[in-house]
Amino acid sequence: SRGNHPRLTPKMQFANDYSMNLETFLYWSLADYFKNEKRIAFKIEQSELSYLTIYGKTNRFFHGHQVRFAGGIGGLTIPLYKAIHRWNANIKADYNFMCDKHTYSNPTPDCQCNGSLIGYNPMAVSFGFAYQKPLQSFTLLDSKRGYTIKAPIFCE
């Protein structure tokens, strides 16, 4: 899913954010470069939400700027539950992958937040995120047992 940082407009665009985002152009360029490589496929959505079914499980991918929590004591959990509930009313997802909050966590049983590849930085300080080393998330979906492993990948 696209992020909100490489947008070409001062504020988020909703109907056309895919065409106003440098990451979209990067994805299109990569898709063109690898167009003859049969082992690689790109799924470049025009929507903020992307769905991918694997082993009969529907996975939802989203950046996360859609979920706002204003630094409340409950943190991200309640607003995230509400967003997932609203989205599930349209398309039910078995699991959710979010990238925006720059902190690796599993805030709900059906959602994993990706860590920050660059690690703790001035933005993390400004938003009050807890210190974390540079990391990404890993989730294993087994064809028979479902989601079995959720773990950080340390990127130092």
Show the residue positions of the predicted features.
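Catalytic phosphate/metal-binding cores of nucleic-acid and nucleotide-processing enzymes, i.e., regions
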Residues: 51
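Conserved beta-sheet core of the metallophosphoesterase superfamily
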Residues: 16-46, 55-156
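Active-site neighborhood of divalent metal-dependent phosphoester/pyrophosphate hydrolases
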Residues: 1-12, 116-119
